A protein has these predicted regions:
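Intracellular terminal tails of multi-pass secondary transporters
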Residues: 2-6, 12, 19, 25-114, ...
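Extracellular/periplasmic helix-loop-helix junction of adjacent transmembrane segments
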Residues: 123-152
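Helix-breaking motifs and short loop linkers at transmembrane-helix boundaries and internal kinks
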Residues: 135, 166-167, 188-193, 205, ...
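Central cavity-lining transmembrane alpha-helices of secondary-active solute carriers
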Residues: 146-159, 378-383
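Conserved MFS/SLC helix-loop-helix module at the cytosolic interface between two early adjacent transmembrane helices
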Residues: 154-189
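C-terminal ends and interior cores of transmembrane alpha-helices
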Residues: 178-190, 407-419
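Glycine-rich segments within core transmembrane alpha-helices of 12-TM secondary carriers
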Residues: 230-252, 274, 464-473
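Extracytoplasmic gate region of multi-pass secondary transporters
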Residues: 328-382
Length: 553
């Protein structure tokens, strides 16, 4: 029945080619053999209309066998076998996840804080003399912003595949050190071409962090525990916005030290701090659950089992095949979610890169403008964490994404109007909070609804990589000549939000219809007592199209 449902999408040819080449290189490093057939499991055949009553005869045995056979690609010392997963009480399970949180989240959050700080501090540097000293005229400043996003978007998909080869504990800290060095060198640029060149290098170096960390977290946490972690991780971005304003205010007093203006010291000091964080991450970060020595063998088995059988009776596929790439590129939900992603990331980058300028045009001087960027980000961090917590508690994503979109709609509508500056500053709070608070939900939502490690990895990289081109657009819509109302800039942001308000209901309605139809097929099968056999391998290959998979709303 379900095989009769067909979806079509417009794909980006160059992105497919880049991903295909990356996958071919990946396969050279990771030859694999086909998994052996496991126990047969009675399930519903939603493609042919034949149904079967689920059987528990082999379920536990099959799960234990799959956990024991798990081979972790990319680890130096892979564990071929693991003990059967232990039975944990609710309190013991909470302690285990807390143990994992304390190991993973602090360093990942710190790394992303500096990542967002380093990409967005150019907005503060602009007020501290960057544009004047480098003689940037016309749209040169906007072009410098845009050139960051081009390699950042293009390299995100290949970077997620490379992560599996070089291991998270080496790849993520390594790129952190590299972009920290690039950021330090940005403080020494003397001309516009040098600034553009360094921004391009920064985009290349930072491309692998965000999609890599989100994919990495999806390998550790069940899907309805993911948004809170992504929220904690991404909360560093909003904290970075507040931190950037405070740092810029303080560093401004160093202007003239050793012949460098304040904008140079912003880049140099924050770049050096990033390098230190990257070096620290080499000693702290771990790889995959099956090779993590801070967990006991029983704890590793439980984490793998809990994640592997999350919303699936037979678990996810662990090996790579070219069809995973094809499935990700041709999946309707990836392309629909890209539009939803753009509806938030466009406003997010627009307000992040130009907030100091927008506030300055309210009539404040430079130091006060830097300080006034702090409260909106503090408010945004609070709203983000509230949204993330309740989204995981309710196991729903779209209501919180919708709330963020509506906040952006109201905030940008206020700022495009002739309202007094105090009212517009209130609108800024809504713009910042709405875009930042909705973002983790968008990322987690697609990750929840893509089944299979490699399909999820490629799909999420496409989602983030292509969606981030909205950031390139946002970096060009706030022009100096449009101050103080920035009608074009705020108008484009309202356009992005409008796209989201159209595509979000489409996704929700489609997911509901699919879930409802699968429930009906299940109910009819139980009533008729009809059976059909699928092997665990066949169910794993079906992934999120399997009859027992339910989409998160």
């Amino acid at each position: 029945m379900w095989r009769d449902v067909r979806y079509s999408s417009v794909t980006c040819f160059h992105t497919q080619i880049a991903c295909w080449l990356a996958c071919q290189i990946f396969l050279v490093f990771h030859p694999h053999t086909a998994p052996r057939r496991g126990h047969q499991l009675k399930v519903f055949d939603t493609g042919s209309g034949k149904t079967a009553k689920p059987s528990l005869e082999k379920a536990d045995e099959t799960q234990v066998e799959d956990v024991n056979q798990l081979n972790v690609v990319g680890s130096e010392d892979p564990l071929d076998t693991l003990p059967p997963p232990p039975t944990l009480s609710a309190e013991e399970e909470r302690k285990l996840w807390r143990k994992i949180d304390l190991k993973l989240m602090p360093i990942l959050t710190l790394m992303y804080l500096f990542s967002f700080l380093d990409r967005g501090n150019i907005g503060n540097a602009k007020l501290d003399g960057l544009q004047t000293q480098l003689n940037l005229v016309g749209n040169e400043y906007n072009i410098a912003l845009t050139m960051y996003f081009v390699p950042y978007c293009l390299f995100e998909c290949p970077a997620n595949l490379v992560l599996k080869k070089f291991r998270p504990s080496k790849w993520l800290p390594g790129i952190t050190v590299v972009w920290g060095i690039v950021m330090t060198l940005m403080g020494l640029v003397k001309t516009y071409p040098e600034l553009v060149g360094v921004r391009v290098c920064l985009g290349v170096a930072e491309a692998g962090l965000f999609p890599g960390v989100v994919y990495y977290l999806s390998l550790w946490y069940p899907r309805h525990m993911l948004q809170w972690r992504v929220g904690l991780f991404y909360g560093a971005a909003s904290i970075a916005g507040a931190f950037s304003g405070l740092l810029a205010f303080g560093i401004n007093f160093m202007s003239g030290t050793r012949g460098l203006l304040g904008w140079s010291w912003i880049f140099i000091l924050e770049g050096i701090a990033t390098v230190c964080v990257g070096l620290l991450a080499f000693t702290v970060l771990v790889d995959f659950p099956a090779t993590s020595r801070f967990l006991t063998p029983d704890e590793r088995a439980f984490v793998i089992w809990r994640k592997k059988y999350d919303n699936s009776s037979v678990g996810e596929e662990e090996h790579f095949e070219m069809r995973h790439l094809v499935q990700a590129v041709t999946d309707w939900q990836v392309w629909l979610h890209i539009l939803i992603y753009m509806s938030i990331v466009g406003p997010l980058y627009g307000i992040t890169l130009f907030l100091p300028t927008i506030i300055k045009d309210f009539g404040h001087n430079v130091p006060i403008s830097q300080l006034l960027t702090v409260p909106p980000y503090v408010f945004a961090t609070t709203v983000l964490l509230i949204f993330a917590y309740w989204s995981d508690r309710t196991k729903m994503r779209f209501p919180f994404i919708l709330a963020g979109q509506l906040m952006c709609l109201i905030g940008f509508s206020i700022n495009i109007s002739n309202a007094p500056s105090g009212v517009k500053y209130f609108g800024v709070f809504l713009c910042v909070a709405g875009s930042y608070a909705a973002f983790p939900g968008i990322i987690s939502w697609l990750g929840n609804n893509l089944s299979g490690q490699y399909k999820r990895g490629v799909g999420m990289a496409l989602h983030i990589g292509i969606g981030n081109f909205a950031g390139a657009i946002a970096s060009n819509i706030y022009r100096t000549q449009d101050a103080p109302r920035f009608i074009i800039g705020h108008g484009c942001e309202l356009m992005f939000v409008g796209i989201g308000l159209i595509t979000l209901p489409i996704a929700v309605i489609t997911y509901k219809r699919i879930n409802h139809r699968r429930d009906e097929v299940t109910r009819a099968a139980l009533e008729k007592g009809e059976t059909n056999l699928y092997t665990p391998r066949e169910l794993r290959e079906m992934g999120d199209r399997a009859p027992d998979f339910r989409y998160t709303l």
